[in-house]
Amino acid sequence: MPVVIGVDSSTQSTKVELRDLDSGELVSTGRAAHPDTGAAPLSETNPTEWLKAFDTALESATANKTQTKFAAISVAGQQHGLVTLDRENNVVRNAKLWNDTQSAPDAQWCIDQRGAAWWAEHVGSVPVASFTVTKLSWIKRLEPQNWSRTTRVCLPHDYLLWQLRGGGTKEMTTDRGDASGTGYWSAKTNEYDYEVLEIVDSNRDWSTTLPRVASPLEQTGTWRDAVIGCGTGDNMAGALGIGLQPGDVAISLGTSGTVYAVSATPTNDPSAAVAGFADATGAYLPLVCTLNATKVFDKFASVLNCDLQQFGELALGSECGAKDLVLLPYLDGERTPNLPNARANLVGLNSNHTRNDVARAAIEGVVCGLLDGLTAINKCGVNTNGRVFLLGGGAQSKAVCQITADLINREVYVLNEPEIVALGAARQAAATLTGKWPSWRATSKIAAQPISTATQSTATRERFAAARFKNFGV
């Protein structure tokens, strides 16, 4: 039985799925944790840890399966991370990850050089601290010795696939989806923007520094006789796993929050809210990302001295709007809106509020921020009137599903697959081998329908926006 392997190399762990090539049936899974990445605003790790985790996860997935034939493999990785390699192909320093916001001053410096509208027009996005281009600037500015040693840079999924191909002198490749999150590759032109890169360092030969961008179904090498796909970013793989169609919306609640939709044309948003990403098929994936999602639920469950299930039950015991209590959930700064130094605010608390209201306000604060992102995507001309899918750990919560349905005033779907990113990577592996996308994908079910009125949901979202503007001016 030919098997394809989908790998999800995320911030916290590596997940591996083995699936039947023809049916997509799940054969087995494996998982391995990554080391802690440090305290905000720093988030770094040694890239070699990803390879170790992959080996461990694969060993778990293939235990007692000696007859399994691997046909193809592909990797989806956390976006935006910066891996630096020297002339001998050794790691120069720990990789700076997407949620490392130390480069916030560099993001502003980059914008100041040309202006937000210029950046949006050139690369589809305005730099924020998460983007790779700002991390390049940070290392050049604060670690000149490391910068001078660096001869190649790549993204996390690029590094892992390069190692699977044998590392060393093997070619480094990336894909258009993950490349579009760097801040120096244009989804509109399908090329690196060297004018952008020269803002960071005009003396470097960038043509030899960056990975080649592979086409969506290109075979980029072999591993144990299995074809290697080009890989992609985690959000792009999520869209593949769902089989996202025009009009559909995906809202992912993990450590970070994302909302995205597919588009036939590239987008650019000078306000910096919407990142004009490419997807993994040849189309586009406008996306909004927030830094604070399920960790807000974890924190407030701890504050309220309850577990996550009890936290959800508390939230459902309150009403839509949490009796006018608003949480601005920026625990460790925020990416959208761009507030890297912000901290969370609980606005409007009075003696009549209960634990139920605090729990509800926490969930509503996270969801309101993501729905504001959906509005921004819609303003870019993208159709968002289709199905609404909730993904990630937050989607396992009945309260999160119900509150999202209430605030968006639409039914919401959840997927019947727990590892949608790994599934998407497996679909890409299968398509790379056969030359066409497989018919198998995640199935879904309706998780919640709105029970609050449109008036209540509108008022709740307007209170959130007003509190944000009053406290942060955005």
What name fits each language-model region?
Residues 9-11, 120-233, 329, 359:
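Gly/Ser/Thr-rich active-site cleft segment
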Residues 29-68:
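N-terminal phosphate-binding loop and adjacent alpha-helix
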Residues 1-30, 38, 75-108, 112, ...:
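Glycine/Thr-rich phosphate-binding loops that ligate phosphate moieties of nucleotide
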Residues 2-8, 16, 70-75, 153, ...:
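Short glycine-aspartate micro-motif
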Residues 180-281, 398-399, 404:
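ATP-dependent carbohydrate kinase catalytic cores
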Residues 15, 58-61, 65-72, 136-137, ...:
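Conserved phosphate-binding loops in N-terminal lobes of ATP-dependent enzymes
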Residues 45, 72-77, 96-99, 123-131, ...:
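Active-site nucleophile and cofactor-binding loops and adjacent substrate-binding regions
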Residues 54-71, 142-147, 194-205, 373-386:
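Phosphate/pyrophosphate-binding loops at sites that engage ATP/ADP/AMP, CoA/4′-phosphopantetheine
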